[in-house]
Amino acid sequence: MKMKAVALFALIACGAAHAASEQVTVHQVTAEGIGKSLGTVKIDETKYGLQFTPDLKGLTPGIHGFHVHAKGSCEPGESEGKVVAAGAAGGHLDPANTGKHLGPYAEGHPGDLPAVYVDDQGNATYPVLAPRLTSLSEIKGKALMVHVGGDNHADHPKPLGGGGARYACGVI
């Protein structure tokens, strides 16, 4: 009986220690709509913040802006009279309405994630950590976005870090 109690306690402890995780399918997006799947991003709760581990293929090599957007849609949307790829996702997640694009480690909006690195084969597999996001509940139902260009986490010389057009999107 004592062994059963110890085993039961161990199982409960392991279950309690298991952190939440979410797998997001990411698709190429254009002004015409949602395209082919480029892979997935696994999001794990860790004691250091949310960890985003991409398993994406078919991207342009280099650094790409990576953000959580405010709305849970990857459909095209209109902005200033133009149809925008994944425009229905809205802007970067900014629940406190800071209006500041200061990067994943500063006091700007929490939708800023560290940039995603894509190797010369077009694969993104390196995880990034978002220390200001601590729970999947903060981003559930929002859009995860990969931009065409890099991100300097500032509004100069180009707005929103200079990441440019939206290239890939998935709903968390």
Question: What label would you give each PLM region?
Answer:
Residues 1-19:
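Gram-negative bacterial Sec-dependent N-terminal signal peptides
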Residues 15-172:
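N-terminal leader/targeting pre-sequences
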